[in-house]
């Protein structure tokens, strides 16, 4: 019975357009029609078919109700942020291992199965391929192949340390962080570490230590440390593997690019060339374009159908 309603959100479209319908169901019930009607008129034509006219109609309908303020608009004193996608080429052995996994995955899906079973199996194979892009030992423990990403990471780290810089390093895979941790210890690089198993008190202690200058590098699992941390001692951010949801990556980068940061921030995204990771980055761009056309640079995310996920595995460049 309220006379006025307001909804605040950082990501109006985090996974799909139906989330926008949910917001408007609270703000202005029936304005966008029933859920079935919204899907028929907007979500399916826009997301599946790229229907420009449907996109423009939806934009015209929602724009009068949206007030959007970005961090750059409200924090004009914040230093610049530069984003670099670094595409690295796997060595011959590493790519042969990846390609064998990819071909085996495609052959597996010829068996069919229910739609949900098929989607779960495809997702599992995609995760295996994504781990292989990082380090072959994440798929086959004990297999020691040169890792293009590991070499790129060490090159970046050496360069930024020589200039007196510090870095936050994010990965979705805790096993990948463990490999990087071993690298840092061999190289004698002081670091901090945080993942989902880190107790709250220890988490606070490690953040405070890094902010006080203890460590040139902070290894962080993306889901455990992507929000709620102030790590402005770092002016570099390295994403070791692309996450499905670009908004999650951006929130992680903002651990350094936030109030209190006095230096420009550089964000690296390390992507393995000619792999599923490049497909994910391409989908990020497509989804961002979709959201920008509706919400002016909204933080859109990726939720893929079974067919879209299978296309990621089948495609090569």
Language model regions located:
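Conserved nucleotide-binding/hydrolysis micro-motifs of P-loop NTPases
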Residues: 11-17, 29-32, 92-95, 138, ...
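Conserved P-loop NTPase motor "coupling/switch" region that bridges the ATPase
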Residues: 1-73
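Short, Asp-centered acidic motifs that coordinate Mg2+ and/or phosphate
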Residues: 4, 216-217, 236
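A short beta-strand element within the Helicase C-terminal
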Residues: 19-22, 229-242, 264-270
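Conserved Helicase C-terminal RecA-like lobe
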Residues: 76-99, 112-229, 299-300, 306-317
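Short, conserved loop/helix-junction motifs that constitute active-site signature segments
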Residues: 1-3, 78-79, 231-232, 259-260
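A conserved SF2-helicase RecA2
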Residues: 244-317
